Curated annotation (Swiss-Prot):
One of its GO terms (molecular function) is triacylglycerol lipase activity. GO terms for biological process: lipid catabolic process. It comes from Malassezia restricta (strain ATCC 96810 / NBRC 103918 / CBS 7877) (Seborrheic dermatitis infection agent). Secreted lipase that hydrolyzes acylglycerol lipids such as triacylglycerols and consequently releases free fatty acid. Generates free oleic acid from the substrates mono- and diolein and hydrolyzes triolein in significant amounts. Due to an absence of fatty acid synthase genes in Malassezia species, secretory lipases are essential for the yeast to generate free fatty acids from degradation of sebum and assimilate them as lipid sources for growth. Plays an essential role at the pathogen-host interface during disease progression. This is Secreted triacylglycerol lipase LIP3. The gene is LIP3. Its EC number is 3.1.1.-, 3.1.1.3. It is found in: Secreted. The active site is at 205 (nucleophile), 352, 386. Keywords: Disulfide bond, Glycoprotein, Hydrolase, Lipid degradation, Lipid metabolism, Secreted, Signal, Virulence. Its main location: secreted. Disulfide bonds join 121-292. Belongs to the AB hydrolase superfamily. Lipase family. Class Lip subfamily. InterPro entries: AB_hydrolase_fold, Lipase_secreted.
């Protein structure tokens, strides 16, 4: 769940500014996951252990950003995993990217924000060379971050953590699939990775759902993983409050996507809601199942999912016993036995206009009360909107990764830090991030900030054009 239209604008600016960049060589067109037989598991897969590789292949990766990014090799892995419950077997795919200067004992699980339900939005498809142009500009934009992490020498594993049904916002499913993507990557013999490989998980916005739940579930689900840290921000830690916050607002399309994801993962919810949806509601869920973020946000701004036009007795959507039971299991930090064991760096803008700050802070505090070592950084500056925060805070994320990978000590217990703007932190310059900070400033100058006002303005313009037409 993220403000996206300004990111599309930013991506276009990148492309216009880099017309001299290397042109990617053409190769065969990849197929979307719903049409590619690679994604169909072989017989007997249900009996395998989670994290087991079912098949793998080499792929060509193209980063649709400033310039072609060099990498040594890339693979896709189909692996056995679990849905929301461990006894619900499923499969999904992760994309593994190995940099030229790969450090064979360091791995980053990068849970990119997909925030949509369409098959062609899956990272394993979008990341491939010659995937449909700009099928998901949001993911294409986030690949700007990939190059920075790859430059550190860290191998990346990027899972399709929403699974074959693309169950966006089904946090427990996403957590399991992210963890099993790590296990599958460690099991890929071509990489020669040790079981003691140091692993860090990262995610922002919709990607932080997968990362936050992976951090919560890993100690019991895959306790032997050598997790040395988790870092995530803009976190929808409480799905109920997030849906209520999104509802009726500019990014309301993400609420529609979230409802579709929950319906598609939980049969009890599907059985309850399907005969209550209006024609408009059914059409909305069908639409998001076929489209990616930009199309969804443009199609459903200001939509009220709690209205009678969406479903009969719409106000009951989030308050019915069935929905409350399911949504109650999707709140981070509630159960003491689901507390991250590895160090956590969590960050959130105080003025985040998309994801409620309070819910994220509450989850972090509860984790701390349950024994987690967690630094929660609150950004108070007026330029810190939901979308701008991820990019502006990239230096601190990289610093956290470097320190965890090198074994430096971390805080004990819970600590709350207040910062105006991360790029104004003297530590960013002192740690050698001055060049990266300048690049970030130049990239977002006059494009984001002030509550991501540009994103809101563009959606309002789109809405007016639709009314006129």
């Amino acid at each position: 769940m993220v403000s996206l239209l300004w990111k599309f604008t930013l991506l276009c600016l990148f492309l216009l500014a880099c017309t001299s960049a290397e042109v990617l060589e053409r190769s065969s067109k990849p197929q979307t996951p719903d049409k590619d037989p690679f994604y169909d598991p072989p017989s007997g897969w249900e009996e395998k252990e989670h994290g087991t590789i079912l098949r793998s292949r080499k792929v060509d990766i193209a980063f649709f950003q400033i310039a072609k990014v060099k990498y040594k090799e890339a693979y896709e892995i189909l692996y056995r995993t679990s849905r929301s419950e461990e006894d619900q077997p499923s499969t999904t795919v992760t994309t593994v990217i190995v940099p030229e200067n790969a450090k064979k004992d360091k791995l980053v699980n990068m849970n990119v924000y997909v925030d949509s339900n369409g098959a062609r939005c899956a990272p394993s498809y979008v990341l491939q060379r010659n995937a449909k142009l700009a099928t998901d500009p949001a993911l294409s934009y986030q690949q700007v971050l990939f190059s920075t992490i790859l430059d550190e020498g860290y191998i990346l594993t990027v899972p399709d953590y929403q699974g074959p049904k693309r169950a966006f916002a089904a946090g427990r499913l996403e957590g399991h699939m992210a963890i099993d993507g790590i296990l599958a990557t460690l099991n890929l013999k071509e990489l020669c990775l040790s079981k003691d490989t140091k692993v860090i998980g990262y995610g922002y916005s919709g990607g932080s759902i997968a990362t936050g739940w992976a951090a919560s579930l890993q100690p019991s689900y895959a306790p032997n993983l050598n997790m040395v840290g988790w870092t995530f921000g803009g976190t929808p830690a409480n799905l109920t409050s997030t849906l209520e916050h999104l509802n009726g607002g500019t990014p309301a399309g993400f609420a529609v996507s979230g409802v579709a994801g929950i319906v598609d993962e939980y049969e009890s919810v599907a059985d309850w809601i399907n005969d209550k949806l209006t024609h408009k509601g059914k059409h909305a869920l069908d639409f998001v199942r076929e489209h990616c973020t930009v199309g969804i946000v443009l199609r459903y701004p200001f939509t009220n999912i709690l209205s009678d036009s969406f479903m009969k007795h719409g106000a009951q959507l989030l308050q019915s016993p069935i929905m409350k039971k399911v949504l109650g299991t999707l709140n981070m930090g509630v159960r003491p036995d689901e507390t991250p064991k590895a160090p956590v760096y969590m960050f959130h803008a105080k003025l985040d206009e998309v994801i409620p700050y309070g819910s994220a802070h509450d989850a972090a505090k509860r984790w701390g009360d349950h024994g987690a070592d967690i630094l929660f950084e609150e950004f108070t500056g007026l330029v810190m909107g939901h979308a701008s925060t991820e990019l502006l805070n990239l230096p601190n994320v990289l610093l956290f990764m470097r320190d965890r990978m090198s074994g430096k000590p971390f805080i004990h217990g819970y600590e709350h830090k207040h910062t105006d703007n991360p790029l104004e932190d003297p530590g960013v310059i002192a740690k050698g991030f001055d060049a990266l900070a300048e690049t970030i400033k130049n990239a977002i100058d006059n494009t984001v900030g002030m509550g991501d006002k540009h994103m809101k303005a563009k959606i309002e313009q789109s809405r007016r054009r639709r009314i006129v037409s």
